[in-house]
């Protein structure tokens, strides 16, 4: 697991620098902590970047320790699965969706809008 705690503010609309874009491998997830909260940053097979809350909605385990494949993150504790693009819970044991956040890449940096 890679963990970042950069957290630089960009512009006035709450875009936060999460990590360098090159630090997230294709079909992988990293942890990002900011302001006492934790998030998960994903890179899809088509080179898109996505962000969700970092903890599984079932038992609060960090998703950055999970398995990513085909736009799905699987929780490392009980194998609950979420679509990380939409946050949709994909069956038992998870039944509550993940919160998702807008993401963009500028100047080689992944920015997440938390506001």
Regions found by a protein language model. Give the residues of each.
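Zn-dependent metallo-beta-lactamase
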Residues: 2-34
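Rieske [2Fe-2S] iron-sulfur-binding domain
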Residues: 24-115
